[in-house]
């Protein structure tokens, strides 16, 4: 069975998910998942929704997930030495040196990601995940590429593990550069030709080889394998990343966030259409003139603003819709639905009041962030870990970073759920310290709280590396000793000055005492000028 036939067979199981994704896309971002699969998208056929709430919440949630998964100012992972190997094979004293080297490697990896188009493609994939629930990312040599749900099919086992992926894309004949049949020579039953004669359909088949345990993929065009298109990759570092937003046991495809709240979106769409059309009808001004009136309709039509015409007021009337109460009911319901949708997509709505404290805004924001926990769990497993493994493999193969021993070094994800956990730890720690300071006073806080341990825990909660930033206990003790020595020397100099002013140190009466005092002053000054020993 060739790739085209395999794609068509697996597409039957995708149809129900694709239809639901198209419905969700039509209410939010219609251009994400279009109705036409065989030709290039024609945006003239896209229907614009009557409301923009769906588009707003999708874009906002995608931006939040983007910043949480790949934060721009920090790393989303940490390279750490396995604790069970640290005591056996590595000297614990070199732990700080390893952390410093790992931090340099982490910055190199983040610089590589920042210089690429990864964030742009990942943001696009997140919008597909929120709307359609599925997305496919290919990590190629030239960067990342996103496949929407109508361009790929996937086959999974009962546990959700990927067994097979088949993609379909339109590629220009000039780009392929192969000896392809001319337009019109293909068979009428051959679906590899598209409506555009310059484009051909190329299928990519991705399978997991059971014998070698590696991913194998190749491309076909006109049911023939394209020469040089066969490639392989390790099982844990595949460039093909099929992503899901929500999973259901036994289903090959995921469910999107929009599908969970599509009822409110459909209701808001209907109410918005009714309000817009009703408001347009109510805004239309039509005058009625009594047939027995002496005032002619032409007189009213031709009268300018502020003009004076002859007539009786009761002969002229204005048509009124009289649906103000009905419009108010629909508008109130639309506002309630919009508020529910904003809460569902984690869009913060601050209470409209004269006095809204910063603490209330902070608690609202923290409550919204806690709702991201379930979303992060699946994205961490299906996206961040495979994405990091593939990036490490690419950089190690190109010798941009040194090869890391897998049995000693283990990368760990610190973004997503872990970042939310650290944020809660920071919040609890600051509240605990603040409560002690307010109830018992600053003196009790300094007496019972260990400052160095509190600083370390705050830095760990915020994901800050304290290496060479926070002073160690040895450095603090050394500085205290230096301060004590300087204080003692200063006291000795002051005492010597007081003794020098006494009558017993008069050179005319006691010459030997003056010489001894001079030697003590010189010795104290030399000790004070000596640099501190490290």
Predicted regions and their residues:
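C-terminal anchoring/interaction modules
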Residues: 1-20, 24, 288-534
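An N-terminal domain-start capping segment
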Residues: 29-56, 112-113, 182-213, 299-321
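Long, contiguous amphipathic alpha-helices that act as assembly "spine/axial" helices in icosahedral shell
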Residues: 55-58, 62-63, 100-142, 253-288, ...
């Amino acid at each position: 069975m060739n790739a085209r036939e395999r794609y068509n067979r697996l597409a039957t199981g995708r149809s129900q998910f694709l239809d639901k994704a198209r419905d969700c896309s039509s209410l939010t971002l219609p251009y994400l998942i279009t109705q036409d699969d065989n030709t290039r998208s024609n945006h003239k056929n896209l229907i614009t929704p009557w409301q923009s709430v769906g588009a707003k919440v999708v874009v906002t949630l995608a931006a939040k997930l983007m910043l949480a998964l790949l934060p721009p100012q920090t790393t989303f992972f940490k390279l750490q030495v396995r604790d069970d190997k640290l005591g056996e094979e590595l000297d614990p004293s070199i732990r700080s040196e390893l952390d410093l080297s790992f931090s340099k490697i982490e910055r190199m990896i983040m610089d590589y990601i920042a210089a690429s188009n990864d964030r742009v493609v990942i943001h696009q994939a997140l919008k597909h995940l929120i709307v359609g629930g599925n997305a496919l990312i290919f990590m190629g040599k030239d960067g990342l590429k996103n496949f929407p749900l109508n361009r790929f099919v996937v086959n999974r086992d009962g546990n959700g593990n990927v067994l097979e992926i088949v993609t379909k894309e339109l590629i220009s004949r000039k780009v392929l550069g192969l000896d392809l049949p001319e337009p019109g020579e293909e068979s009428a039953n051959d679906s590899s030709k598209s409506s555009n004669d310059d484009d051909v359909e190329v299928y990519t088949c991705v399978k997991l080889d059971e014998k070698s345990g590696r991913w194998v993929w190749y491309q076909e065009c006109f049911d023939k394998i394209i020469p040089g298109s066969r490639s392989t990759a390790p099982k844990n570092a595949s460039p093909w990343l099929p992503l899901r937003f929500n999973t259901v046991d036994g289903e090959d495809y995921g469910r999107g966030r929009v599908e969970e709240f599509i009822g409110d979106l459909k209701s808001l769409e209907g109410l918005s259409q009714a309000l817009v059309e009703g408001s347009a009808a109510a805004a239309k001004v039509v005058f009625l003139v009594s047939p027995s009136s002496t005032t002619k309709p032409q007189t009213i039509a031709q009268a300018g603003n502020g003009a004076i015409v002859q007539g009786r007021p009761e002969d002229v009337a204005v048509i009124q819709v009289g649906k103000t109460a009905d419009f108010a009911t629909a508008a109130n319901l639309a506002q309630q639905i919009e508020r529910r949708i904003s809460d569902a997509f984690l869009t913060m709505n601050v209470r409209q009041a004269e006095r809204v404290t910063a603490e209330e805004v902070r608690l609202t924001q923290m409550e919204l962030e806690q709702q991201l926990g379930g979303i992060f769990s699946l994205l961490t497993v299906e996206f961040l870990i495979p994405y990091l493994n593939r990036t490490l493999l690419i950089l190690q193969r190109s010798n941009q970073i040194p090869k890391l021993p897998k049995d000693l070094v283990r990368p760990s994800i610190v973004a997503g759920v872990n970042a939310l956990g650290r944020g809660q730890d920071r919040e609890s720690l600051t509240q605990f310290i603040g409560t002690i300071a307010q109830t018992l006073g600053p003196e009790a806080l300094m007496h019972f709280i260990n400052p160095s341990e509190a600083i370390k825990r705050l830095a760990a909660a915020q994901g800050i590396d304290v290496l060479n930033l926070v002073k160690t206990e040895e450095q603090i003790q050394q500085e205290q000793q230096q301060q004590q020595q300087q204080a003692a020397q200063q006291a000795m100099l002051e005492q010597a000055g007081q003794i020098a002013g006494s009558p017993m140190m008069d050179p005319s009466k006691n010459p030997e005492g003056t010489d001894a005092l001079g030697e003590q002053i010189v010795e104290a000054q030399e000790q004070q000028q000596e640099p501190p020993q490290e």
